Amino acid sequence: VKIDKKARSILNSFPKDVQDYFQEISEKCKKHQFKFRVSSGSKVYSGSGSCGGFFSDSHKELAIAINSPLKWVVAILVHEDSHFDQWINRQSVWHNPKVSRNITYFFDWLSKTKNIKNPTESVKHVISLESDCERRSIKKIKKRWSHIISPENYAQSANAYMFSYLYMAHSRKWISDRINIYSKCFYRNFPQKILSKFEDLSEKYFELFCKYDKNARAAPNRAALRPINRSL
């Protein structure tokens, strides 16, 4: 584990079961020859921006920032651990060539280095990867972490996260950091169960994102770095 003195102090203040989970992730990373980086800040630099945590198979690293409310530290660690599980399972959506290709297309388009005919269709492949991750995560939370974060709140923030990609497909820019999917005043607008489909951005949700979006570029709160080094 790569962890500084301040981060170690923060980690030691966490409940024992959470500390044990960090140790489990450390051992999992060691087994698969990944680095596990624990930051004392509220965000960690992913190489393409700052975020709460990320999993990168190209850099072989899982990283998380822990100077945040405990429930969201646990939520982000569970999310990145679920991306790790996707990577381990060679049959998962993580290894689907069509999904990877469209993820590349979408983020190249978002960064304005490539034009594509239908960004909404490409972004649905991003969402397919993330929604699979979120369903894995909600199972872990219900089984083990519901005393720290309510599954309903997690599902609401996960739904907000998925819809944020549909919004970005309309705006062609990263969402503003004013759009905080971990803020109750924002995530309370979304369903308490993870939706089965994310086909369209309703007018209601579009207006909600517009209300909070101030056109500032910001990396997403969660990240999973694909081999192409894009943040998801």
Question: Where do the language-model regions lie?
Answer:
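Long, well-structured alpha-helical subdomains associated
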Residues: 69-72, 116-130, 135-232
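Generic preference for flexible, low-structure residues
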Residues: 80, 92, 98-100, 170, ...
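Short amphipathic C-terminal alpha-helix that caps PH/PH-like domains
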Residues: 80-81, 137
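Generic signal for short, ordered secondary-structure residues
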Residues: 4-8, 60, 112, 116-119
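A metal-dependent hydrolase signature that marks the N-terminal structural subdomain at the beginning
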Residues: 1-44, 58, 135, 196-232
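Post-HEXXH active-site segment of zinc metalloproteases
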Residues: 87-128
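Active-site scaffold of zinc-dependent metalloenzymes
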Residues: 15-18, 28-73, 81-88, 94
